[in-house]
Regions:
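Mobile amphipathic helical/loop "lid" adjacent to a hydrophobic cofactor/ligand pocket
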Residues: 140-241
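Conserved FAD-binding subdomain of flavin-dependent enzymes
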Residues: 112-142
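Glycine-rich FAD pyrophosphate-binding loop
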Residues: 86-107
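N-terminal Rossmann-like FAD-binding beta1-loop-alpha1 element of flavoenzymes
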Residues: 68-92
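Bacterial N-terminal signal peptides
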Residues: 43-55
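Active-site/ligand-binding neighborhood in enzyme catalytic cores
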Residues: 194-293, 297-300, 307-309, 324
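Mid-domain catalytic core of redox enzymes
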Residues: 289-406
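Conserved flavin/dinucleotide-binding core of flavoenzymes
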Residues: 354, 370-512
C-alpha cells in the first residue's frame, strides 16, 4: 500500500470519526434543556473545534531538520558534514558546548602569542589533510615523528634530518641492528592488521601488555626499550603497561621506518575547525545543544536536545543520525530502541588516556638557551617527567617565549583531579624544570593551566583492543544510527577523520 493511499485512508477515518462525534453531540444537545439559540451556538463551537482538529490530523509530518543529524562538532562531526555537503546532502550538527572543534583548541594571549590547548598535530596520513588542502588551509611540518628525549638524565637532541640518522646518534651499532630487526617485524605485523578477520596469532596479543611483550620478545636493549616507551606513551596518554601488544603494534606504525610527519596549521589548529565550520555553514551548527534522546521511528530519527543556556528542549528530525562524540558520552543519551548489549559492553569496557596542558610564559632572552643546541631549537622534547612533552608555542619577535607542556598519563590524571591547588601544580612543574634545566624557574613569568575531561583520548585495556569484535560492533550502524569519532577507531585524530568517511560512505550507499 503506497503512502498516498495510506494518507487518504487516514483522512477518511478522521472524517468518519469526526462525523460520529458530531452526531452524538447533536443527540446530546437535543436531550438538554438549552434554548434553540444556545444550542445553535454550542453546535457551531463544536463544529469549529472538530474542524480545527481535522485540519491538524490531515497535516503532513513535521519537516526534516536535515538529511543527517550529527551529534558533536569535533573533527569527526565537522568532517562528516563536509563530506555530506560535497555529496549534496544536508546535515545539521548539534554540539553540547559553546566551542566548535572538539579537542582542536588554540589559546591566544594579549601579547599576540598562541599555543595549542588540545590537539597538537595532524599526522600526514590523516584524511583530514585532504580536506584542509581543499579548503586552502595553510599547514607546516616542523619536526619528525621522533623527538628529542631525556633518558637517565641525559638529553638526546633531535638535530638530524631523519629518524634513521637520529637513531644512529642514540643507539650503538649492536643496539641499532637489533632495533632494525624488531622494527621490520613490527612493520610486517602492522600490514597483517589490515586483514579481516585477523589471524589468531595476532588476536592473542590482546592478552599481554605492550610493555611485557616488548620486554620478553623484542630483543631490544634497555635503552631502545625506553626509547619506544618514552616516544609512544604521549600518543595514547597512558602507560604502555595498560594497553595490549596488539594496540601497541598499531601505535608504533607512526614511528616505524622513516616515520610519519606531523602537520600543524599555521596560526593555530583552531583555524582548521573555523574553516570547516564556514564551509559547512555556521547556521548548520547549533551550539550548547545537549542531546538527551535518540528515538528511531518508522518515518526516521527523532533527536531531543536541551539548550544548555535556558534548558529548553527541542526535537530535531532526520533520515539518519551520526553520533560523533567520545563513546562514554553515549551514556548521556537515552536510545529508543536501546543500544544492543554488545555495544553497551564495548562502551563500558573501553578505557582512556588523560592529558593536561600548561602554557608557560618565560623571559625569551634568559630561557632560550635551555632548549637550543648550537643555536638550533631541539623542541619538542619528551621529558619523561611531570613536564610531559615540551612544545614551543608561537610568540611575537622580541616578546616572551611561550612553552606548551603536554602532560599525559598518571601526571595528567593527578593534575586534572584538582586534589592539588594551582600553586602546588606550579611548584611541581618548576621543580621538574629546575631538575632538568637548573635555574630555569627564574625565567618563568606565568603559567596557565588547561584541563581535559579525564577521558581525553580512547584507549583499550589489556584484554580489549580496537580490533576486537566489541569495537567492530560500534563501527556498524544500529538501524539508521551511526557511531563515529576517534573513540570508535583509534587514539588519534586520524580515527575521527576515518570514522567520518566510514559513516558517510554507508549513508550515501543507502540513500542512492
Amino acid at each position: 500500500m503506497n503512502s498516498a493511499l495510506l494518507s487518504r485512508l487516514s483522512q477518511d477515518l478522521a472524517l468518519l470519526s469526526s462525523g460520529l462525534q458530531l452526531a452524538n453531540i447533536l443527540k446530546v444537545t437535543q436531550m438538554t434543556t438549552l434554548s434553540p439559540k444556545q444550542s445553535n451556538r454550542f453546535i457551531i463551537f463544536i463544529v469549529l473545534t472538530l474542524s480545527l482538529s481535522l485540519r491538524s490530523a490531515a497535516l503532513p509530518a513535521e519537516p526534516l531538520s536535515a538529511d543527517v543529524l550529527i551529534v558533536g562538532a569535533g573533527l569527526s562531526g565537522l568532517s562528516a558534514a563536509y563530506h555530506l555537503k560535497k555529496a549534496g546532502k544536508t546535515a545539521l550538527i548539534l554540539e553540547m558546548s559553546p566551542h566548535i572543534g572538539g579537542r582542536i583548541r588554540t589559546a591566544s594571549y594579549p601579547d599576540g602569542a598562541h599555543a595549542e590547548v588540545g590537539l597538537e598535530e595532524f599526522w600526514e596520513n590523516n584524511p583530514a589533510i585532504e580536506i584542509f588542502k581543499d579548503l586552502k588551509i595553510p599547514m607546516e611540518t616542523a619536526y619528525s615523528s621522533f623527538s628529542s628525549f631525556y633518558y637517565q638524565g641525559k638529553l638526546y637532541p633531535f638535530i638530524q634530518d631523519s629518524n634513521p640518522e637520529f637513531l644512529r646518534s642514540v643507539l650503538d651499532t649492536d643496539e641499532l641492528q637489533a632495533y632494525k630487526r624488531w622494527d621490520a617485524k613490527m612493520a610486517e605485523l602492522y600490514r597483517q592488521l589490515q586483514q579481516r578477520p585477523l589471524p589468531d596469532e595476532l588476536l592473542t596479543l590482546m592478552e599481554t601488555s605492550f610493555a611485557d611483550w616488548i620486554k620478553n620478545t623484542s630483543g631490544l636493549s634497555p635503552k631502545a626499550q625506553e626509547l619506544v616507551r618514552i616516544e609512544t606513551e604521549p600518543e595514547y596518554a597512558t602507560s604502555w603497561q595498560k594497553i595490549s601488544a596488539l594496540d601497541g603494534i598499531a601505535e608504533w606504525h607512526y614511528f616505524s621506518g622513516n616515520g610519519l610527519a606531523p602537520r600543524h596549521v599555521i596560526g593555530g589548529n583552531q583555524r582548521a575547525a573555523q574553516a570547516l565550520a564556514r564551509f559547512i555553514g555556521k547556521d548548520r551548527i547549533r551550539l550548547n545543544q545537549l542531546v538527551t534522546h535518540i528515538k528511531s521511528t518508522v518515518s526516521g530519527e527523532e533527536v531531543t536536545a536541551t539548550d544548555q543556556g535556558n534548558f529548553k528542549q527541542q526535537i530535531f528530525r532526520a533520515k539518519y543520525v551520526v553520533t560523533a562524540i567520545p563513546l562514554f558520552r553515549l551514556n548521556d543519551i537515552q536510545f529508543t530502541p536501546e543500544l544492543s548489549a554488545e555495544r553497551k559492553q564495548a562502551i563500558q569496557t573501553q578505557s582512556a588516556g588523560a592529558y593536561f596542558t600548561a602554557h608557560v610564559r618565560v623571559d625569551n632572552n634568559a630561557a632560550r638557551s635551555f632548549w637550543t643546541y648550537n643555536g638550533k631549537s631541539v623542541l619538542p622534547i619528551m621529558t619523561d617527567s611531570p613536564l610531559g612533552v615540551i612544545y614551543e608555542g608561537e610568540s611575537k619577535p622580541g616578546g616572551d617565549a611561550l612553552l606548551n607542556l603536554l602532560v599525559s598519563g598518571a601526571d595528567a590524571e593527578r593534575f586534572n583531579s584538582r586534589m592539588s591547588d594551582p600553586d602546588q601544580i606550579q611548584e611541581t612543574l618548576l621543580t621538574a624544570f629546575d631538575k632538568q634545566w637548573p635555574g630555569f624557574r627564574q625565567a618563568v613569568k606565568q603559567m596557565s593551566f588547561y584541563r581535559y575531561h579525564p577521558r581525553a583520548v580512547a584507549s583499550w585495556p589489556v584484554g580489549r583492543s580496537r580490533f576486537d569484535e566489541l569495537s567492530d560492533s560500534l563501527r556498524k550502524p544500529q538501524g539508521r544510527v551511526y557511531f563515529a569519532g576517534d573513540f570508535t577507531e583509534d587514539t588519534h585524530s586520524n580515527g575521527a577523520s576515518q570514522s567520518a568517511l566510514r559513516v558517510v560512505k554507508d549513508i550515501l550507499q543507502k540513500s542512492d
